[in-house]
Amino acid sequence: MTDSVFGTSASATDAVEQRMRIQLEVNGERIEREVLVRQHLVDFLREELGLTGSHLGCEHGVCGACSVIVDGELVRGCLTLAVQAQGKAVETIEGLSDSGQLDILQQAFLEHNAMQCGFCTPGMLLTARALMQELLEPSREVIREYMSGNYCRCTGYQAIVDAIETAIRRSKALGAANSLGSAKESLAPSTSGTVSASEVSL
């Protein structure tokens, strides 16, 4: 059967409206939902899960406002279908910090005034998170290149790059402090009441 106005068949319309049950993890929480196979990931997050921190901007994968992390990879939520997240782990801006405190990136953005209207900020933060997970000590030029896929009409980008540099520096210092603490614990004498030969040699 063919639609006389648009020339589309009923079977094609049925395919567009087809639904599929998916299971995925969003910010550490197991989720199971039935979704339209044509629904984009950003729409699923916003409309089905109420995670409205992922913003919908250009809808063409250009502006970066809808950026989320899927299995450790930065993706555009407006170009990714929800069904493509089947069995995967999705991280949104809402999952950037699970402690109730500002994440190291959020704190740096706040200190450097790296936001104004805030529309691009969630995508910026998640892109910066992906950068920090991928590269340990990126140069300022590398940071600029990595962030070039995220558009901001307000800040001029200078403060954003400054904030990311600050977050990277603090993260590195925190990692060094944690490593030192672990080393001290491993060298601490046993409190079990017996002393091994290896401890005596220390």
Where are these regions (language model features)?
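Signature of N-terminal electron-transfer/Fe-S-associated modules in redox systems
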Residues: 1-202
